């Protein structure tokens, strides 16, 4: 079973580069294997009934259940509001199904808090090899116009590697932390430059922007560490609160013609954001309900006429996590979401080792920015990508932090 986990840690980033859609399946399988491994271990020790429940949250026992509740009360409030919003959404049944799926995945992450493994060095090496393989596979596909992809698909477009690039950009930060922990600072810098170049020639603008800003965040977190938490918190929360207002005020036609004439996909984003901002004004407090974006009706006169082409103003989701939260859950949901953002930034700031803290900030911002530009916040593969990073941090990074502290 440990060999299987070792193989998956290698395969998820490398296989994910070629077939981004497989990320959801492979990461979910990875999490289930970890849980099964731990269950088998407890059963063999005949300690399953009590210790499994205790180790769901390692620092607390049965007598401290209320402490656990208080520790995750912000998460519980957010989950409760998401559930309540399912009751008044456009399609309650569909929203409840999505709600169940999303928070079942998040609970699976919670259960994975119990996991500990021996031979961590092998797991680290497997992840590093997986990242190197993913990089090589990208350049093979890029230079050969999808030689490997066309073996099992009829055509190839560079956009097919977008999900793999997104996964690579956030997973690379875990490897950078590992390299720093081993004193290989130059190797960490080289890896960052190589991945940055890869993303710059890819079709994934969101990943490139997120990874680039992540690098800037790393430097700032090291240089001004005393005030960095306040700076990043104020910037992130203020920017998130202002974004719906900015999206309402922009002129997408004018901006698209001036700056995005050669990037139709990015231009379409501006129209989507402007449309969503106008929809938010109609139901600003409560929103339209959990996972309701793709069910919001649009009339013919709301269709976008851009360069003689008709574009949909809201195709499935807003392509921006802040706008999606505000649209679906209202200002109440956005406030709870930003409380979670503050909480997780504070937890990162509590890390004592400077390089670990800086790289963790970078990874968080990288993930946050990609979500601000591209993906549906409730998308299974994107949620699992975040869980994948958290589990890697727990398995491969946290033991080093504890030892160093």
Curated annotation (Swiss-Prot):
Primary residence: membrane
Q: Where does it live in the cell?
A: Membrane
Give the InterPro entries listed for this entry: O-antigen_ligase-rel_domated, WaaL-like
**Protein's membrane topology:** Multi-pass membrane protein
Q: Which GO terms describe its cellular component?
A: membrane
Q: Which Pfam families match?
A: Wzy_C
Tell me where the transmembrane regions lie: 23-43, 77-97, 120-140, 156-178, 201-221, 227-247, 270-290, 322-342, 353-375, 377-397
- Keyword set for this entry? Membrane, Transmembrane, Transmembrane helix
Family in the record: Belongs to the O-antigen ligase family.
- State the protein's name: Putative polysaccharide ligase RT0347
Source species? Rickettsia typhi (strain ATCC VR-144 / Wilmington)
């Amino acid at each position: 079973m440990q060999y299987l986990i070792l193989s998956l840690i290698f395969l998820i980033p490398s296989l994910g580069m070629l077939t981004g859609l497989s990320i959801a399946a492979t990461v979910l399988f990875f999490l289930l294997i970890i849980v099964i491994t731990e269950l088998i271990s407890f059963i063999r020790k005949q300690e399953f009934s009590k210790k499994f429940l205790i180790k769901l949250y390692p620092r607390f026992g049965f007598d401290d259940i209320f402490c656990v509740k208080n520790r995750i009360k912000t998460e519980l409030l957010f989950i409760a509001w998401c559930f309540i919003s399912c009751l008044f959404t456009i399609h309650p049944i569909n929203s409840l199904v999505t709600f169940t799926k999303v928070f079942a995945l998040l609970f699976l992450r919670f259960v994975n808090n119990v996991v500990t493994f021996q031979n961590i060095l092998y797991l680290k090496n497997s992840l590093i090899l997986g990242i190197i393989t993913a990089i090589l596979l990208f350049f093979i596909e890029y230079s050969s116009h999808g030689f490997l992809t066309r073996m099992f698909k009829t055509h190839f477009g560079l956009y097919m590697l977008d999900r793999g690039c997104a996964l690579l950009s956030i997973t690379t930060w875990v490897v950078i932390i590992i390299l720093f922990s081993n004193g290989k600072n130059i190797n960490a810098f080289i890896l960052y430059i190589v991945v940055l170049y890869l993303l710059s020639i890819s079709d994934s603008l969101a990943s490139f922007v997120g990874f680039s800003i992540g690098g800037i965040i790393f430097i700032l977190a090291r240089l001004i560490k005393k005030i960095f938490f306040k700076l990043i918190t104020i910037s992130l929360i203020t920017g998130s609160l202002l974004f719906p207002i900015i999206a309402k005020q922009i002129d997408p036609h004018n901006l698209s013609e001036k700056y995005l004439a050669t990037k139709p996909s990015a231009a379409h984003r501006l129209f989507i954001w402007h449309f969503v901002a106008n929809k938010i004004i109609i139901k600003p407090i409560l929103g339209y309900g959990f996972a309701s974006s793709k069910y919001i009706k649009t009339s013919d006169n709301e269709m976008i006429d851009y360069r003689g082409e008709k574009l949909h103003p809201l195709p499935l989701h807003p392509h921006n996590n802040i706008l999606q939260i505000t649209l679906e859950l209202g200002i109440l949901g956005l406030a709870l979401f930003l409380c979670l953002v503050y909480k997780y930034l504070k937890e990162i700031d509590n890390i004592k080792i400077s390089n670990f803290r800086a790289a963790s900030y970078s990874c968080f911002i990288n993930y946050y920015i990609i979500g601000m530009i591209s993906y549906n916040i409730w998308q299974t593969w994107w949620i699992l990508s975040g869980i994948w990073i958290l589990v890697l941090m727990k398995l491969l990074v946290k033991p080093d932090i504890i030892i160093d502290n």
